[in-house]
Amino acid sequence: MTPQTRRERERAERHRLIIDTARELAESQGWDAVTVRRLAERIEYSQPVLYSHFAGKDEIVTAVAEEGIAEMAAWSRAALESAGGEPRAALAAVARSYLDFATARPALYDAMFLMKVNLAFGENASQPLRDAFAVMFAAFSPFAGEHDPETFTEVGWSALHGLATLDRGGRLRPTQRDARLAVLIDQLTR
């Protein structure tokens, strides 16, 4: 192994450590607790070392968000495939997996959709974002009818995001989660 190869490997390992530590800290104490100083202390490197990987907290959150989107896409894809090709069942499974993901990974969900990140959506989207949208599109588009399928998917995804955000914020009755999801699926599949 050449010294350059070793340095590249060590740099990649540090990069991974920064992201993993940010996720762990956010999940245990919230995103306000994630600072470059605290991350440097946790991983036992100086702040300049962290800044050699990321320009600041926003870039770290962006890296975490992109990973989260890839994870959410995998959850949603598994749900879609479990539905056996029946469109309504597929939509219901994807919708439930989305809400479950938001509940199971709150800090990750916040990084993905509620915090300031530098992720391009639309035509310039990264592959994880495209993959996530593709799963949503596969679930929602069969019900678009006369509407543009991509726009219909965006509206459906927005509705799920609203339910997830309000539910996680304690602004909806916890006992009615399944009923709300059933209403949404009924409305979208008319």
Q: Where would I find each of the regions flagged by the language model?
A:
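N-terminal intrinsically disordered/low-complexity leader segments
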Residues: 1-13
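Generic hydrophobic, amphipathic alpha-helix propensity
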Residues: 11-22, 39, 64-68, 72, ...
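Short, structured helix-loop boundary elements
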Residues: 15, 36, 58, 62, ...
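Helix-turn-helix
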Residues: 17, 25-59, 63
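Hydrophobic alpha-helical connector segments
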Residues: 63, 77-107, 129-132, 156
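Amphipathic alpha-helical packing segments from all-alpha helical-bundle domains
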Residues: 70, 77, 101, 113, ...
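Amphipathic alpha-helical segments used for helix-helix packing
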Residues: 101-120, 165-171
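Amphipathic C-terminal alpha-helical segment
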Residues: 157-175, 189-190
